[in-house]
Structures are given as structure tokens and as C-alpha cells.
């Protein structure tokens, strides 16, 4: 039995999802009394220049680099068993060895497909349990390695795909993707309507426009939607200050029809009152939408995991996928008018959702390492406390 285990969570800053999952797991471990938890961006610390270049190329995949990313994602999938696997397995290895020597972790978790640890296990024989937490509704071969002890995946579909490519079923646990605990609280929606000055008698369209590549014509689209009766449009611009300032002028023409926000810390609050949401199909965003049963309109998925996520949610009846700018207004307006379709999509989201995935993952890891959790009460957010 490990009395006070040290947990090392390896991640990478390609988008916010991998890091967000790492932070959620870190918080969950701490809630269960495991205080010694380290989150490390292994690639960023090992090769900062290469990482900056690849992050830039990753962001360009949302605009001019879609075909390049398609070639990378699906091309690597086909040739992964050859030379690329050997090169990638050693990426970050020097920094990893120093990290393991300095920190001496008892448990290693990957929220990004980093196979340096299992490869090091294979080559040196070190004994340390390694867990991979997949952050999409699909799987790429780059996540798979014989020295990984267990995989935590979003759905049974992902598990079946992994079994088909040779991963033993007993090594795969269907838990869902870890999301922030705020998405699993019960909150009185009336408080949210008042906080954001929204009308509970109108439908609400949420546009998450801060994400990379979401809707190049947000301003024109908002102007079109403002003419739709009994509809309020809420746009979250994130850290895109230029977009926010551009939309503020539009909002001033009809502040009841359009609400514009920058970065919203508790975005789950807006999820709870929206009728449907336009967004990009990132694994974490879709998991959060599933938790609160929000029908989604997925805008122009990038080839790779985004496209795989979008196709899965479309097959399940939980999403409408739009691949052409000219379709956005018409398809969104039609969906907002179709209450039966919206209800069916909410039910589909409910069927996809797996409750408390972070707890499930952490409890499984602690049990396998014979660690007894010591739950620490966490104070609920102020808005959640107002629920009656």
C-alpha cells in the first residue's frame, strides 16, 4: 500500500483541452487527500522552440493548414508502426528522465499522447504504473503502447475500436472525459437569467466564438439572428478582444437581442440556459455539452480528432454538423424552430454523458495502487449555494 503517493500528470498546451483535463484530475486527487500532484508540460519544457512551432502549425490547422493537418493526423495513423513511432517515443525523453529522478512519482498519467514514459519502461524495466486519459471521442494509434497499464476512454465505441486494434479489453475503462466539477452541480436557472440579463421566455442561442476558427463572419451572423423573433443571441468571445469590441457596437443597436461577453469563467452557467450552441467539436467542450444536455451545432470541423468527434455526435443524433458558411443561418434557425428535434438532441446528449468521470478515473487509479482516499470537503461556488 502506498501511503502518500506522488502523482505526475503529463500534458501539452495544444489547445486548452489537454491541460484542462490535467487540472481537473489534479483537483480531484487533491479533493481525495492526495496532496503531492505535479502537472508538467513535458514537450514544452523539453523542446520549447519545436513546441512553439508545432503549436503555431496546430492553430493554423483551423484556417489555412487544414489539409496539412489532415495529412499529419491520418498519415501518421497509417505509418505509426514504423520509423515515426521510434522518433516520437524518444521526444522529451531526456527531460523525462530528469523529472522521474527528481520527483520519483508513484503514478504517471498522460492527458496528451506522450509515450515517452511507457517507452522508457520498456527499455529500462522501471516499475511505475502509467495511465492514459484520452480526451476525444475517438482514438489515434499514437495513444497506444504495450507498457500503458490502463486507458480511460469517453465511450464504449472508443473501447471497441481499441480492442479491434489489439488492446486487451480489460485494460480499457469507459469513464467519459473529465470535465470541470461546476458542470455537474445543480443550479437554479432563474439566478443565471438574472445574472446575465437574459429573458427566460425566449430561446437562447449561444455562440462560443473565442475558440480558434469558430465562425469567421460572427458579426454578420449576429445581425441576421437579431431579426429572429423571440430569440436572444449570446456570444462568448473568450480572449478575442478585437471580436468583442467589434460586436459591442452591434449589441448597442438592440441590447435585448444580443449579449456579448469576453472570457466567461463559469461558462457552465450559460450552457444551462441555452437552447442550442454553435461551437467547435473539441472533446472537452462536447463532454461539457453532454453533461448539461445542450444540443450543438458543430461548425466546420478540422480534419482529425475534431472531425471524428463531430461525426460521432452526428451519428448519435446529438449534433448538427455544418461544413459551409452559407448553411449556418438557415440550419440554425430551422433547428431553433424544431422543438421536437431539440428534445431528441438533448436525449441523445444524455445518453452520451457519463457522470463524474474525474472521480471514476481517480478512484480507479487509487484503488489499483491500494491508496485509501481521504475526502476533503470543497466549498461550492456562490451561485451553486443559491440553489433552492
Curated annotation (Swiss-Prot):
Pfam short name (any one): Glyco_tran_28_C
EC number: 2.4.1.315
Enzyme class: transferase
Gene: ugtP
Compartments reported by the entry: Cell membrane
Organism: Bacillus cereus (strain ZK / E33L)
One of the protein's GO biological processes: lipoteichoic acid biosynthetic process
Biological role stated in the UniProt entry: Processive glucosyltransferase involved in the biosynthesis of both the bilayer- and non-bilayer-forming membrane glucolipids. Is able to successively transfer up to three glucosyl residues to diacylglycerol (DAG), thereby catalyzing the formation of beta-monoglucosyl-DAG (3-O-(beta-D-glucopyranosyl)-1,2-diacyl-sn-glycerol), beta-diglucosyl-DAG (3-O-(beta-D-glucopyranosyl-beta-(1->6)-D-glucopyranosyl)-1,2-diacyl-sn-glycerol) and beta-triglucosyl-DAG (3-O-(beta-D-glucopyranosyl-beta-(1->6)-D-glucopyranosyl-beta-(1->6)-D-glucopyranosyl)-1,2-diacyl-sn-glycerol).
Keywords from the named record: Carbohydrate metabolism, Cell membrane, Glycosyltransferase, Lipid biosynthesis, Lipid metabolism, Membrane, Transferase
GO cellular component: plasma membrane
Family the UniProt entry places it in: Belongs to the glycosyltransferase 28 family. UgtP subfamily.
InterPro entries with a match to the protein in the record: Diacylglyc_glucosyltr_N (IPR009695), Glyco_trans_28_C (IPR007235), Glycosyltransf_28_UgtP (IPR050519), Pro_diacylglycrl_glcsylTrfase (IPR023589)
Protein name: Processive diacylglycerol beta-glucosyltransferase
UniProt main location, coarse: membrane
Catalytic activity: a 1,2-diacyl-3-O-(beta-D-glucopyranosyl)-sn-glycerol + UDP-alpha-D-glucose = a 1,2-diacyl-3-O-(beta-D-Glc-(1->6)-beta-D-Glc)-sn-glycerol + UDP + H(+); a 1,2-diacyl-3-O-(beta-D-Glc-(1->6)-beta-D-Glc)-sn-glycerol + UDP-alpha-D-glucose = a 1,2-diacyl-3-O-(beta-D-Glc-(1->6)-beta-D-Glc-(1->6)-beta-D-Glc)-sn-glycerol + UDP + H(+); a 1,2-diacyl-sn-glycerol + UDP-alpha-D-glucose = a 1,2-diacyl-3-O-(beta-D-glucopyranosyl)-sn-glycerol + UDP + H(+)
GO molecular function: 1,2-diacylglycerol 3-glucosyltransferase activity
Record has Amino-acid biosynthesis as a keyword: no
Stretches that traverse the bilayer: none
Listed pathway(s): Glycolipid metabolism; diglucosyl-diacylglycerol biosynthesis
Amino acid at each position: 500500500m502506498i501511503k502518500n503517493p506522488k502523482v505526475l500528470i503529463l500534458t501539452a498546451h495544444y489547445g486548452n483541452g489537454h491541460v484542462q483535463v490535467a487540472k481537473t484530475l489534479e483537483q480531484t486527487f487533491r479533493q481525495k487527500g492526495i496532496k503531492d500532484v505535479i502537472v508538467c508540460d513535458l514537450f514544452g519544457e523539453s523542446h520549447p522552440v519545436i513546441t512553439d512551432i508545432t503549436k503555431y502549425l496546430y492553430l493554423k490547422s483551423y484556417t489555412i493548414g487544414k489539409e496539412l493537418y489532415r495529412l499529419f493526423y491520418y498519415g501518421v495513423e497509417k505509418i505509426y508502426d514504423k520509423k515515426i513511432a521510434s522518433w516520437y517515443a524518444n521526444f522529451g525523453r531526456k527531460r523525462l528522465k530528469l523529472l522521474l529522478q527528481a520527483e520519483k512519482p508513484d503514478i504517471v498519467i498522460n492527458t496528451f499522447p506522450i509515450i515517452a514514459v511507457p517507452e522508457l519502461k520498456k527499455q529500462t524495466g522501471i516499475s511505475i504504473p502509467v495511465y492514459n486519459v484520452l480526451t476525444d471521442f475517438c482514438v489515434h494509434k499514437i495513444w497506444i503502447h504495450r507498457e500503458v497499464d490502463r486507458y480511460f476512454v469517453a465511450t464504449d465505441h472508443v473501447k471497441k475500436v481499441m480492442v479491434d486494434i489489439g488492446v486487451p479489453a480489460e485494460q480499457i475503462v469507459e469513464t467519459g472525459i473529465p470535465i470541470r466539477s461546476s458542470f455537474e452541480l445543480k443550479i437554479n436557472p432563474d439566478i443565471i437569467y438574472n445574472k446575465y440579463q437574459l429573458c427566460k421566455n425566449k430561446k437562447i442561442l449561444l455562440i462560443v466564438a473565442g475558440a480558434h476558427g469558430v465562425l469567421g463572419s460572427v458579426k454578420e451572423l449576429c445581425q441576421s439572428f437579431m431579426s429572429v423573433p423571440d430569440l436572444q443571441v449570446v456570444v462568448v468571445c473568450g480572449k478575442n478582444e478585437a471580436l468583442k469590441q467589434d460586436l459591442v457596437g452591434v449589441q448597442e443597436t438592440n441590447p435585448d437581442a444580443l449579449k456579448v461577453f469576453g472570457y466567461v469563467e463559469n461558462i457552465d452557467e450559460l450552457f444551462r440556459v441555452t437552447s442550442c450552441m454553435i461551437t467547435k467539436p473539441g472533446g472537452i467542450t462536447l463532454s461539457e455539452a453532454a453533461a448539461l444536455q445542450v444540443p450543438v451545432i458543430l461548425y466546420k470541423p478540422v480534419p482529425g480528432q475534431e472531425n471524428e468527434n463531430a461525426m460521432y455526435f452526428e451519428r448519435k443524433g446529438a449534433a448538427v454538423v455544418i461544413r459551409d458558411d452559407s448553411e449556418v443561418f438557415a440550419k440554425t434557425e430551422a433547428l431553433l424552430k424544431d422543438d421536437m428535434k431539440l428534445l431528441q438532441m438533448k436525449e441523445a446528449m444524455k445518453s452520451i454523458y457519463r457522470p463524474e468521470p474525474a472521480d471514476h478515473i481517480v478512484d480507479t487509479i487509487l484503488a489499483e495502487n491500494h491508496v485509501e482516499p481521504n475526502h476533503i470537503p470543497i466549498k461550492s461556488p456562490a451561485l451553486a449555494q443559491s440553489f433552492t
